[in-house]
Amino acid sequence: MVGWKYSAPFDDLDAQAELGGYPIRNDNLANESKCGKTEHRVIDPGKDNLGSDIVVGGEGTGIVHMAPGCGDIDHKVGKKLNTVSIAPLDEESKFSNKFGWLSGKKATDKDTIDEIISYLKENEIADSLGQVKPSFNK
């Protein structure tokens, strides 16, 4: 599966079309016409600094979404693999502009979460949702 490309649920949001990433632009990636939309692909994130696999097949689904603009491990993997970084939230956990119908909404508010879940279901992106406790929260 490594190398497979795919489209993602929020590719219609303006931030995904920003060459080089958003809100911080990587000029090298921009010059290669790379943006969030063009960079969705299955990767092998490799190992952490202790030599352990970052994604383990026996935990959860064995498939993890990497978001280089969101979180330390994802950022490090994205930097290593030279991927576009999209950081959707400001310092108040609100979606910044260029995120369409989500702009200005607080990511942790129940109403925002419910809207996102409804969007995923209405667009047949998710039919059932549950929670998987990440291994880094053990």
Please give the residue ranges for each predicted region:
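Protease-associated
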Residues: M1-I63, D72, K76
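Residue patterns forming the tRNA-binding/recognition surfaces of aminoacyl-tRNA synthetases
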Residues: D48-K138
